[in-house]
From Swiss-Prot:
This is Phosphopantetheine adenylyltransferase. GO terms for molecular function: ATP binding; pantetheine-phosphate adenylyltransferase activity. Signal peptide: none annotated. Its cofactor is Mg(2+). Reversibly transfers an adenylyl group from ATP to 4'-phosphopantetheine, yielding dephospho-CoA (dPCoA) and pyrophosphate. Substrate binds at S10, K42, T74, R88. Its EC number is 2.7.7.3. HAMAP family: PPAT_bact. The lineage of its organism: Bacteria, Pseudomonadati, Spirochaetota, Spirochaetia, Leptospirales. It comes from Leptospira interrogans serogroup Icterohaemorrhagiae serovar Lai (strain 56601).
Length: 160
């Protein structure tokens, strides 16, 4: 049986913390789908096309990886593509409380889908897309927290 996992998120923007979780996930599963959530009720800095472009560029050459977008519930997307696992990265205990509650609901909705929690590597444990955007808005360098293509796009977008 193939083990297919999805790694869902808005990835607005993609961070080095996301990439850390992704690379480690690729060692655990036969295939991982980065599933970019499209939520019309959520305001994003980067369009879905921009986020897809960043992820495609940064993950070029990674084996066992697919990139897709989805709307609706994560477990419905899992069932649609035949995934049996959802990957979630955890930075701190506060992340766990929130993610654990969601994983319990997901289990009720789709008993066949497991949530796999991966702790962030220490050097990425403080990084979040929200914090990166806030720091960049104030003109500070975020190149240690995001891939180069994202850092350049942030500078360009926030200087407009």
């Amino acid at each position: 049986m193939k083990h297919l996992a999805i790694y869902p998120g808005s990835f607005d923007p993609l961070t080095k913390g996301h990439l850390d979780i992704l690379q480690r996930s690729l060692g655990l599963f036969d295939k991982v789908i980065i599933a970019i959530a499209v939520n019309s009720n959520k305001s994003t800095l980067f369009s879905i096309e921009e986020r897809l472009g960043f992820i495609r560029e940064v993950t070029k050459g990674m084996k066992g990886l697919e990139i897709d977008t989805f709307q609706g519930l994560t477990v419905d997307y899992c069932n649609k593509v035949g995934a049996n696992s959802i990957i979630r990265g955890l930075r701190a205990v506060t992340d766990f409380d929130y993610e654990y509650a969601i994983s319990l609901m997901n289990k009720k909705l789709a008993p066949n889908v497991e949530t796999v929690f991966l702790m962030s590597s220490g050097e990425y444990s403080f990084i979040s897309s929200t914090i990166v955007k806030e720091v960049a808005r104030h003109g500070r360098d975020v190149s240690n927290q995001v891939p180069e293509i994202v850092s350049k796009a942030l500078l360009k977008k926030l200087s407009q």
